[in-house]
Amino acid sequence: MPSRNSINRPKLTVNLNRKNSSISKKRDQRERAGLLQPARSSADSKSGKVKSVPLDLYFEGQKDDHASAKGITNKTLSKKRAKKIERNIKYAQQRRLLTDATAKLEADMEIDIDQKKTKDAKPKTALEQVKEALWNAVEDTSNSGLIIENGQGTVLGGPYFP
């Protein structure tokens, strides 16, 4: 019989069939043992989520994403790891509070600016309206943009030989 890496052998189909059959046997064995419950499409499935045994142990009694499906486990959670998880949860709550507070502050600031404009709005005299129109025209001409002249000595203007 030729070796596994021999040239004159239909390797691909044989190897793929063997691999697929062994995978299906393993999957059937896991299903019979009840290890594939719940299904991956189920909402209770942890498929695609980060697997963390310490978090599962920490949140075991709570109804949460980390709640463990099994009640009995052979793993324990050390006191040091439990304190670390509690500390990280506390930091996450503080970050959430901080972001909420800053978002609220920014929203309040926008409202305050609008209120100041409405409070400060007084009826303008004709002279003030003319002054404002003239200053707006001056600002528009001064902010017209960058004007590049076609002078000597610039890259755009051509060569410069001193």
From Swiss-Prot:
Question: What UniProt keywords are attached to this protein's entry?
Answer: Cytoplasm, Nucleus, Ribosome biogenesis, Transport
Where it mainly occurs, coarsely classed, is cytoplasm
One Pfam family from the record? Alb1
Is-annotated flag, keyword Nucleus? yes
Question: Could you tell me which InterPro entries the record lists for this protein?
Answer: Ribosome_bgen_Alb1
Q: Which GO terms of the cellular component aspect does the record hold?
A: cytoplasm; nucleus
Any GO BP annotation: ribosomal large subunit biogenesis
Question: From which domain of life does this come?
Answer: Eukaryota
What are the subcellular locations of this protein?
A: Cytoplasm; Nucleus
The segments labelled Disordered in the record are 1-50
Would the keyword Nucleus turn up in this protein's UniProt record? yes
Question: Where are the compositionally biased (Polar residues) regions?
Answer: 1-23
Which family is this sequence assigned to?
Answer: Belongs to the ALB1 family.
Primary role: Involved in proper assembly of pre-ribosomal particles during the biogenesis of the 60S ribosomal subunit. Accompanies the pre-60S particles to the cytoplasm.
Q: How does it assemble?
A: Component of the nucleoplasmic and cytoplasmic pre-60S ribosomal particles.
Name of the protein: Ribosome biogenesis protein ALB1
Question: Which gene is annotated as encoding this protein in its UniProt record?
Answer: ALB1
